[in-house]
C-alpha cells in the first residue's frame, strides 16, 4: 500500500474541501524542493505567493515530514506526488524537484496547467565531449566525480555531506552567507532526511535524463536560472532552450542555485507575472 504524502496549504484549501456554494478561482501552485532539503526552504516566498494564490508545499518522499516514506524511482515518486495534487495546478520544482516537475508534466499532464522549473535541467550530470561521445551529446552540468564523491561521503557522514552540498548551492551568490544560513535553518526545522533516500536522490540526479522528452511538454513553461549557479551553469541555458523552444527562460542576476532565497521579491514577481499571463 502506497503511503500518502503529507503536505500543507497556504492561502486557501483544496478545491474539493471548499463548500459547494463557494466559488474558488485562486490559482493553485505546488512547490517541490530539492535534494537534501524539505519544503521549509520555501518559507520565505510561500507567504508572498499565498497573497494571490493557493500554495501547496509537499515534502518529497524521504525528506522532511515524509522522511519515513522511501524515495524510489522517478515514475513511482511522480505518481505519489500526483496523488496529492489537484488537476490543473501550477507546478514549481526547484533543482531535483524540477526533474520531478518535468516528469509530472509529461506523465500526468492533467495535473499540470503550467510548469515552472527553478535552477533545474532535464539532465543534471555533465556529459563530456570525448572521442566516444559525439560532440552533440556533450552536456553542461555537475561533474560526475562530484556526485560520486557525495555518494561515497554519504556513508561516512551524511550531515557533513548535506552541508557541503548546501555550500555549493550558495556558492557564487552575492548573498552566499545569508543563503547558506537560510538553507541550514530549513533543514534544522524539520525531521532529518532518510539516508537511503538521500542516496536515491543522488542517483536520480545522476541517472535521470529527460533531454529527449522535454520537447514534448505541452504546458506553458517558465525556466528560472541563477546567473552565478555552478550546478546548472548559465552556459547550459541555451542548450536547454534548444530542446524546449517554446519555454520562457529568465536568468536572474547576482544569484546562484537558490534564487528564491537570494532575491525573494524579484523571484515572486517573475513567478506571478508568468502565472497571470
Question: Language-model features: where?
Answer:
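Conserved alpha/beta-hydrolase "acid-adjacent" motif
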Residues: 230-236
Amino acid at each position: 500500500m502506497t503511503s500518502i504524502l503529507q503536505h500543507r496549504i497556504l492561502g486557501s484549501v483544496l478545491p474539493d474541501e471548499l463548500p459547494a456554494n463557494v466559488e474558488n478561482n485562486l490559482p493553485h501552485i505546488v512547490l517541490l524542493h530539492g535534494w537534501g532539503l524539505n519544503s521549509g526552504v520555501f518559507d520565505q516566498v510561500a507567504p508572498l505567493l499565498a497573497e494571490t494564490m493557493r500554495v501547496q508545499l509537499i515534502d518529497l518522499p524521504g525528506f522532511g515530514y515524509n522522511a519515513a516514506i522511501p524515495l524510489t524511482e522517478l515514475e513511482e515518486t511522480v505518481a505519489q506526488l500526483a496523488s496529492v495534487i489537484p488537476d490543473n495546478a501550477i507546478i514549481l520544482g526547484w533543482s531535483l524537484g524540477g526533474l520531478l516537475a518535468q516528469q509530472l508534466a509529461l506523465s500526468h499532464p492533467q495535473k499540470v496547467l503550467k510548469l515552472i522549473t527553478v535552477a533545474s535541467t532535464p539532465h543534471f550530470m555533465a556529459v563530456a565531449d570525448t572521442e566516444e561521445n559525439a560532440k552533440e551529446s556533450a552536456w553542461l552540468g555537475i561533474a560526475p566525480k562530484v556526485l560520486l564523491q557525495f555518494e561515497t561521503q554519504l556513508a561516512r557522514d551524511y550531515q557533513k555531506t548535506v552541508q557541503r552540498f548546501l555550500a555549493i548551492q550558495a556558492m557564487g551568490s552575492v548573498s552566499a552567507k545569508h543563503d547558506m544560513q537560510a538553507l541550514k535553518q530549513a533543514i534544522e526545522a524539520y525531521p532529518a532526511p532518510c539516508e537511503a533516500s538521500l542516496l536515491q536522490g543522488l542517483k536520480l540526479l545522476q541517472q535521470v535524463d529527460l533531454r529527449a522528452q522535454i520537447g514534448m511538454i505541452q504546458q506553458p513553461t517558465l525556466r528560472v536560472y541563477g546567473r552565478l549557479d555552478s550546478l546548472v551553469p548559465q552556459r547550459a541555458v541555451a542548450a536547454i532552450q534548444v530542446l524546449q523552444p517554446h519555454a520562457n527562460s529568465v536568468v536572474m542576476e547576482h544569484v546562484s542555485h537558490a534564487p528564491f532565497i537570494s532575491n525573494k521579491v524579484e523571484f515572486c514577481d517573475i513567478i506571478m507575472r508568468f502565472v497571470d499571463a
